[in-house]
Structure formats: structure tokens, C-alpha cells
Amino acid sequence: MVELHDLQPHWGATKEKKRVGRGIGSGHGKTAGRGHKGQKSRSGDRKMPPYFEGGQTPLYMRIPKRGFKNPTRKEYTPVNVGVIDKLFEDGMEITPEVLASKGLCDEKDRVKILGDGELTKKFVIKAHAFSKSAKEKIEKAGGKWEIIS
């Protein structure tokens, strides 16, 4: 009867671990299969990252630097007046919180109103920025725009 302590893998399912550097009688002594000298024979040899070029100045350092990251940059979430016209009723006051409730932006986002689409309803729109065409369309429809900080 087979018991738990008698279980072992099927013959051929596992491979013996190759023990290298254990004397010449093993067949893998002396250099342990690493050959003579060179980077790959040394201890600590590992796969080099793809950008390593053998010690010569790497490509990313040979190419000149360009541009910079502006630490004071302000990013805006764009919302078009045509979208506002479709989603909201006439006479409403539109704020970033109202736009966020409809899923057009996050509540924390800075909002810029752009002038794509037609505006047929009157709105009071409060946002962080407006394009020139958006301002014109809001005023033409009889609405008002207001910049908030």
C-alpha cells in the first residue's frame, strides 16, 4: 500500500542539480564550466540590462538633453460648450462640481471651457479658463462666463 511518506516524483520527472566546482573528478571542477577569464567567468556575473554597452558611454548619455519639466505648469480638463448645451437645462449655473457630477471631469481638476459645438441655451458658466471662441459663444447665447481661481 502506498503511504504519504513513500510518495516520490515519477522517474525522469526531475533532474539532478549540477554541482559545479567540486574537483576534477566531477567533470565540472576547476573553472566550473565558465571557461577562462573574461567578464562571464567572474563572480557576480549577471545578465546585463539592455542599455548597458560594455562600459562605453551609453547612447542616452551621448545624446544632448532637451527641454525641461515646468514645475508651475497648470493642466486643464477641456469641456466643450456643445457638450454643456446637450447635458444641461437652460438657465443653469455650471461649475466644476456640476460638471464632475455628470462625469465630465474630476472635482479636483482645473476646467477649461472650449468653443467646439453650438450653444443655444443661456448659462452662467464658472471655470478656471475659457477659450476666446467659448467666451464669444456664451455671450452670443445670452449667458455669462466667470473665471474662478
Swiss-Prot record:
One of its GO terms (molecular function) is rRNA binding. It holds the Pfam family Ribosomal_L27A. The keyword RNA-binding applies. Residues 1-64 are annotated as: Disordered. GO terms for cellular component: cytosolic large ribosomal subunit. Binds to the 23S rRNA. This is Large ribosomal subunit protein uL15. It comes from Aquifex aeolicus (strain VF5).
